[in-house]
Amino acid sequence: MKVIFSIVVFSVLILLFRHKRIETKIVINQPIDHVWQVFKCKSSHPKWNTLFGIDRFPTHVGQQISVDLYNENRNVQFSMQPVIKKLDKYHLEWEGKLYINGLFNGKHQFIFTKIDDNTTQLVQAEDFNGLLVPILNYFVIQPTKFNFDRMNKSFKKYTEDQTLNNDNCKVPR
């Protein structure tokens, strides 16, 4: 009877807590066009991106890209191939999954908002869904929020110190 009760309780918990959203925000003291150009400049990513590496910056919705997630030493911890769900000016969103759909899915968002002519807000968020969310919350989801904050701070510092003037990544100033 205890085993059946435990299975029922565990099943109910999985059904109730299979969604989790994390969100971080940072204000960057640069115009939004400059911030967006730095973000899109793939060749600058190794200088500031402590969270992931991408094979190329996406160009259209529906495109599949390769993303390598880093650990704190910037070694590849996990690779995935998410699909671009939204790509507008100042907004990038992709969706990926762990092995099969519904097990552990994530929708990652980068949203840049103009505060004033010289200030931009970056919101980085992830919506996790799936059966493994309750189990992976402590070991994966909570450390991910910490890593978002770390990447945001690194991106802010790099962007505020950077004047883009090379051929690959130009920003009119």
What is the predicted role of each segment?
Residues 16-17, 51, 103, 133-135, ...:
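Short, aromatic- and cysteine-enriched interfacial helices/patches
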Residues 2-60:
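Hydrophobic ligand-binding cavity/cleft-lining segments
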Residues 2, 121, 126-173:
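A conserved amphipathic terminal alpha-helix motif
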Residues 55-58, 66-70, 97-100, 113-116, ...:
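Short C-terminal domain-edge/linker segments immediately following a structured domain
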Residues 43-79, 85-89, 172:
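Short beta-edge strand/loop motif at the mouth of beta-sheet-based domains
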Residues 34-39, 45, 65-67, 84, ...:
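Hydrophobic pocket/interface hotspot
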Residues 2-6, 15-17, 47, 73-119, ...:
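Hydrophobic-ligand binding "helix-grip"
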